[in-house]
Amino acid sequence: MSAFDPQAHSPPRCGPQFPSIGQEPPEMNIYCESFLHPQTMPSPQRPSNFETGDYSTTANPYLWLNGPSITPPPYLPGSNSSHFMPQAYGMQRQLLPNMHGLGSSELGWLPIPSQEELMKLVRPPYSYSALIAMAIHGAPDKRLTLSQIYQYVADNFPFYNKSKAGWQNSIRHNLSLNDCFKKVPRDEDDPGKGNYWTLDPNCEKMFDNGNFRRKRKRKSDVSPNGQLSSDKPEGSPLSESPTNGEHQDMLGNSSPGTDDSPEKRSPPPSITPCLNNFLSSMTAYVNSATPISRSVPLGLSNETSDKMGQNMVGFNSYTPLSNMPSHGGSDWSSTVSSNPFGYSSSVFNQFTPHFYNSMSTNNTLYNREGTEV
């Protein structure tokens, strides 16, 4: 490439005073490339790729825009040095001032907010009770006034600076309604206004690494002698209670300490005796010929046990419809009962409302003693 003097050969069209719009007009780019390079030689797409030893290799993509922070060497050595492009056209500033390569920080020019600005936008993941507990827990004397709690929340969480009225009311409500916060009056020699608020010692274990776990109190946590009664988790089905003790006795897994108790309640009867009593009572009602006027007493006697094999004899009067002789319409309606199952009327007459009214489910099916739930 032959050297030339840009001042002697530069036409006035090559350096018009274009406004700084951030990109090169296509007409200007075509004209300058056709003027500076012969048509027979392939012209590069970017002027920063000229193969000259005077240019130092750089990774800045905006070198050809001739920003004010870039001072490229002139084409011809001498005191009268000029830049490759006119200064009026390259008024765009460098977008990536601290950039050493495109791969390092491509988005370095974006306005990234600081941490304080992010905290103003994002709500803290803590409840108001947790904020109060954090403020009191961080105080030297483990007590703070209401105004001091406000100040702690506002200083450490900039999110609450924009709407103070809303969250301050919530702070006051939590102090009044939460049992973990206790009001302590001021001393006589302590000047100031307002009472102190402290954290209940029993609730300190609920404050764990800034997480105020909302958990109901358990009566089994602290026994009368001041020791933990049990280490079983909350809601365990094996907790000590009279009802659960009865179920354990029924399953045969009662604890050894309750075997010698003088007030031990009798275990409820098993399912099989209850079912047998029910079947025997039904057998007695079906086989009885006289009207029933009173309920049969509970108990599985030997007579009813002997009749267990004969309890279904009364149901043998079932007659299939296919074996019945043909009758007329009047004979059929007069001789056959209206029930759809084919049973004789004598069997169904035994199960009258008087039969069900005479049976007491409380004393016939189950024994009332020892089965209270």
Swiss-Prot record:
Give the region (Disordered) as residue ranges.
1-23, 208-274
Described function: Transcriptional activator. Activates ectoderm, in addition to inhibiting mesoderm and endoderm formation; required at the blastula stage for normal formation of both the central nervous system and epidermis, the two early derivatives of the ectoderm. In addition, also required to maintain the regional identity of the animal cells of the blastula, the cells that are precursors of ectodermal structures. Also plays a role in differential adhesion, which limits cell mixing as primary germ layers become specified.
Q: Which residues bind DNA?
A: 123-217
Expression across tissues is: Expressed dynamically in a dorsal to ventral wave in the animal cap ectoderm in late blastula and gastrula stages. Expression is present in the cap in a salt and pepper arrangement which is maintained throughout early development. Expressed in lower levels in the mesoderm. At later stages, expression is lost from the developing nervous system, but epidermal expression persists through tailbud stages.
Which gene is this protein's source? foxi1e
What residue intervals traverse the membrane?
A: none
Induction of expression? Inhibited by nodal signaling downstream of vegt, and by notch signaling downstream of dvr1/vg1. Neurula stage, but not early stage, expression is regulated by canonical wnt signaling.
What's one GO BP annotation on this UniProt entry? cell differentiation
Protein name as annotated: Forkhead box protein I1-ema
Q: A single GO CC term, please?
A: nucleus
Location in the cell reads:
Nucleus
UniProt GO MF annotations? DNA-binding transcription factor activity, RNA polymerase II-specific; RNA polymerase II cis-regulatory region sequence-specific DNA binding; sequence-specific DNA binding
Q: Is DNA-binding a UniProt keyword of this protein?
A: yes
Q: Which InterPro entries match?
A: Fork_head_dom (IPR001766), FOX_domain-containing (IPR050211), TF_fork_head_CS_1 (IPR018122), TF_fork_head_CS_2 (IPR030456), WH-like_DNA-bd_sf (IPR036388), WH_DNA-bd_sf (IPR036390)
Superkingdom of the source species: Eukaryota
Biased composition, class Polar residues, residue ranges: 238-258
Iron-sulfur among keywords: no
